[in-house]
């Protein structure tokens, strides 16, 4: 993941940024991305659902390949953010998590499986994290 590129794009966001698709406010999107980062960091352990257990391994490449994620894709239920959040607090938290990844946390990724795709390597997690951030930054036009 290129932390500089991501944080420069995040710096283009404001608390008034409007999504090009979806219903999340920008502060909710930042909190959602942070909640997603908590999974590979080992701070959250969402359970695997039946659908993920059945087809997750077959769909796994969509998480880390070069194709963009589709708009309005369903998400992990435990990282849906629907309450009000403080823009600057959420932005700072996400920037801290990005810095943790950039400083070698990928070697310490949790062995807990992704709740849909299952077990991922550190490289797959890294690509998927970037892809997820890129998806949501594009959602807000940056």
Q: Could you say what each language-model-derived stretch is?
A:
Residues 1-7, 26, 130:
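Onset of an N-terminal alpha helix
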Residues 5-16, 34, 38:
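Short amphipathic alpha-helical segments and their helix-coil junctions
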Residues 18, 69-72, 94-101, 108-110, ...:
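Conserved, structured core segments of small domains
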Residues 18-64, 112-142:
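Short, contiguous alpha-helical
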Residues 43-89, 104:
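Short, helix-capping/interhelical loops that line the mouth of catalytic, cofactor-
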Residues 89-96, 131, 135:
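A non-catalytic, amphipathic alpha-helix used as a structural packing/dimerization or gating element
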Residues 99, 103-106, 138-142:
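Charged/polar positions within long, soluble alpha-helices
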């Amino acid at each position: 993941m290129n932390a500089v590129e991501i944080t420069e794009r995040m710096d283009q966001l404001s608390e008034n940024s409007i999504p090009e698709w979806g219903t999340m406010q920008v502060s909710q999107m930042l909190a959602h991305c942070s909640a997603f980062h908590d999974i590979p960091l080992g701070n959250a352990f969402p359970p695997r659902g039946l659908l993920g257990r059945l087809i997750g391994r077959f769909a796994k490449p969509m998480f880390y390949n070069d194709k963009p994620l589709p708009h309005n894709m369903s998400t992990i239920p435990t990282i849906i953010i629907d309450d009000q959040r403080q823009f600057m607090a959420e932005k700072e938290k996400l920037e801290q998590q990005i810095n943790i990844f950039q400083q070698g946390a990928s070697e310490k990724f949790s062995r807990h499986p992704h709740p849909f795709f299952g077990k991922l390597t550190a490289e797959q997690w890294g690509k998927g994290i970037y892809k997820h951030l890129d998806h949501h930054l594009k959602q807000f036009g940056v």
